[in-house]
Amino acid sequence: MELLIKNARIIDAIQDFKGDIYIKDGVINEIAQEIKKDNVEVLNCEEKILMPAFIDTHAHFRDPGLTCKEDLESGSKAALRGGYTGVCLMANTKPICSSKEVVQYVRDKSKELDLIDIHQCISVTQNFDGKTLDHLNEFKDDNEVKAISDDGVGVSNSNIMLEAMKIAKENNWVLMSHAESPEFSKSDMRIAENMMTIRDVELAKLSGAHVHMCHVSTKEALKCIIAAKDEGANITLEVTPHHIGLTKEINDYRVNPPIREKEDVEEIIKAIKMGNVDTIGTDHAPHTLEEKSKGSPGMVGLETAFPICYTKLVRENGVSLNELSKLMSLNPARLLGMNKGRISIGVEADLVLIDIDKKIKVDSNEFVSKGRNTPFEGMEYYGEVLATIKSGKIKYKK
């Protein structure tokens, strides 16, 4: 399989130049200002932006068990339409991903579909019971496991969380923290996030584990995490497109953690500009319209992430496309131990072609995700994904 990409503006975390890319056997084989090859498939970019495909550090595909909301195929196709070729899936499936059987189902189905790379999180506690860690022993020799998380509920018992962090460190896993203190969940969601953030940061320092703080949304939590990172703690910091693109004044859509105040959004953008944020994760969380009408928290995000982030960060706040690529591609690849997220000879050819000058209007009827739950309906942003390439094959083309 050969593909020649012509006339692209090539951008990754450190590069920005015009040129061609030749892909052979799924890998970037040659990069130059001009490449000529006979009898190969050609993609003419017409000077549009070509970036490393995005990798989502935080998504929910609801498969197995909740496939009325999403499944591995629909979620993967939504990812491709949004420019993503890799996702890290949370464990809140049905049954919860606490067993080898569930993990193997996801892996086998993913390979059968052959659409994107899927990394399935293991639950921190068995079946989210908040106390049992024995199931983690099953995965100690499984090199495909990258991360563990009780995302959606969190781990309220501090001793259990510390022990889980120690296990994660022993196995070189990332522990993904959903920072929410249950004591405050019903009364004050700001305090709920802040209190649990403080605890998990301190436990991360104590254990030495790599702790990934998911969907950080308050200015206080940001300050706490950044201070710990500055001290050398092995912590990475994730924010979402909706916590960048919305404030309570614009749309108080139900999501967990909630849409925050203007000052919180300003601090998130400031942290990004200062280089203190590591990844952008969509927290793609599809629901049926019936469930959403009853108050289920969450929104779909894979198909709108880039235009929201590009518009809000690059166009409106002066963040470079290089930095955005770092947040959406390079750093997520590093987090998950993937040889991706950059444009270099010998790297797997996962790429996305984007028209950054094209204005789009969000229309949930055009989503390929089963989910239609979005607060961005009818809003306009810049940046349209034209094509997504996975291992040198064009998997999505508008």
From Swiss-Prot:
The active site is at residue 283. Substrate binds at residues 60-62, 92, 256, 287, 297-298. The keyword Hydrolase applies. CDD domains: DHOase_IIa (cd01317). One of its GO terms (biological process) is purine nucleobase catabolic process. Its cofactor is Zn(2+). Zn(2+) 1 binds at residues 58, 60, 151, 283. Binds 2 Zn(2+) ions per subunit. Its EC number is 3.5.2.3. InterPro entries: Amidohydro-rel, DHOase, DHOase/Allantoinase_Hydrolase, Dihydroorotase_CS, Metal-dep_hydrolase_composite, Metal_Hydrolase. Zn(2+) 2 binds at residues 151, 178, 215. GO terms for cellular component: cytoplasm. Catalyzes the reversible cyclization of carbamoyl aspartate to dihydroorotate. This is Dihydroorotase.
